[in-house]
């Protein structure tokens, strides 16, 4: 995946963050990219109590800040090596705003973080921070499912070739490029899904007629995907193509579950080229139900609604 040059890893100090850390190190090393560890902590309420330190009396907030900065710098030094120099930065405040501020001022082109939940039947994988970043971060965001890292992974690319706007086609191209790069990088397998909209059922139309319409819609979907894939050489990957009909978000999740997907690569806006803060219904539905890591990309021209002074 030779496209990232300045990667930001939102550091998770617990063991569950190891997988995201490993992915960030891999990407930075392969891309000869810069890598920065960022940890954001909430400020402590002021108590007025002072504590004795070697250089004088300090309040609890200052002591905590020093400890976080020191431990993060040590972690960055441990991860550095073989030509990779890892930087570190500790910030204090609202996690979402501080991450967005760092992306803006640091000109990062990829953010990695560990999903807040553990996934599975009883728990959503993506929490408030993940969702906010997926909606509003101007660069690609990779939210990593906290699970044991595998040497080989299965990657699912979700595309929509029915969109004819140039920025939509570029978005699909980016999704396919990233997904195929990941599959090759980790000796994995590539699946591609396009969900087509079925003809609506109606009591006034015979079911055989509806079935004929759906057969024609499926054929058209096959042709669109074939034409799109003609621009790529995936012969080494032998991707499996999925063309389910129905509600887009749920069909993507069903394919991901059936194929035991590790990473879903998808665009996050319903209308490419749209500027603003809202993800499309498809992306929202996927994030509510998916139990895999998600690498989300924005279309060209996307502008984050969160602004900072230069």
Where are these regions (language model features)?
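General small-molecule cofactor/ligand-binding pocket signal
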Residues: 36-38, 87-91, 142, 191-193, ...
